[in-house]
Every structure is written in C-alpha cells, then in structure tokens.
A protein has these predicted regions:
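Amphipathic alpha-helical packing segments from all-alpha helical-bundle domains
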Residues: 69, 76, 120-146
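Short hydrophobic/aromatic patch on the recognition helix
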Residues: 21, 43-53
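Base-recognition residues in the alpha-helical recognition helix of bacterial helix-turn-helix
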Residues: 26, 50-54, 62, 66
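Short secondary-structure transition hinges
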Residues: 97-135
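Basic, helix-initiating cap at the start of DNA-binding domains
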Residues: 1-28, 33-41, 58
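Hydrophobic alpha-helical connector segments
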Residues: 62, 76-102
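Amphipathic, non-transmembrane alpha-helical scaffold segments
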Residues: 10, 18, 60, 64, ...
C-alpha cells in the first residue's frame, strides 16, 4: 500500500518534470524539444521521466491541463460569487490577468498550445476553451438582460 508521503513525493516529482519541460518548451520550442532535454532540465534521468510520461505529447498535455486547472481554480470563486454580471465579468477578467501575469511562461505556452496540439488531443483543449467562453458568454448575456452592459 502506498502511503500519503509517497504519493506526495510522486506528485512533486511529476510537477518538477512539468516545470522543467515548460522551461525547455519555452526556450527551444515544442517541436525541437527532446525527452532528453526535459529529463536534464528537471534533474531526473530518462528512466524517471518515462516512468511518469510515455511521450513528449503526454508531457505537453499534462502541462496544458495543469495551466487550465490553475486558471479555473483562480477564477472559480469569482464565477460563483453572488454579484451582478458586470462586477462578476470584470472580476473574472482581472483575476485572469493576475494569474497570467504571475506565471507568464505557463500562459504563453497555454495560449500558443493550439498550434502544436495533435489531432487526438484537440478535443481536450477545445473543452477547456469552450467552457471558459460559455461562462463568459452567459455572464455577458445576463448583463445585457439586466442592462448592465449597453452599447
């Protein structure tokens, strides 16, 4: 049985790999990055890297999902706030701006990721994107109905 400490250590190693990969992707470009470079930047051997990820695409997808998860965790409280649509929309946009500013490398990666996504992974990206757009659209529509957003 795996104890909590071991689980935490595995998660920390995985996160360290993702941070190393993000740096290499940013420095060298996604297409030119190799698993060797990711392993080296994260401070692990290739065997450890392949224990956690079977391919560069898997690393890419996990970074993308981590970025979206961080964004959602940051704006979720604003989405459920019981305030008017105008204040809610402005609050979400401000929070997103703060999150993006605090981790520029992650979000430069995240916003350029669609250029590199394999066809098999496009739906994952699209799901996150559509969810964000749907929430923002519903807030705007509510604001228009309540006459908080006008021409």
């Amino acid at each position: 049985m795996i104890n909590n400490r071991k689980i935490e250590e595995r998660e920390e190693r995985k996160l360290r790999i993702l941070k190393g990969a993000l740096k290499v992707f940013s420095d060298s470009g996604i297409d030119k990055t190799t698993m060797d470079e990711i392993a080296s930047e994260s401070g692990f051997g290739k065997a450890t890297l392949y224990y956690y990820f079977s391919s560069k695409d898997d690393v890419f997808i996990d970074i993308m999902e981590l970025g979206w998860k961080q964004l959602w965790e940051g704006i979720e409280s604003r989405i459920v706030e019981n305030i008017g649509p105008r204040k809610k929309f402005i609050g979400i946009i401000k929070k997103m701006g703060k999150i993006v500013t605090e981790d520029k490398t992650m979000y430069e990666f995240l916003f350029t990721a669609p250029n590199y996504i394999q066809d098999t992974n496009k739906q994952t990206w699209k799901t996150y994107q559509e969810r964000l757009y749907a929430i923002l659209q519903s807030i705007i529509e509510e604001g228009i109905k309540k006459k908080e957003f006008v021409d």
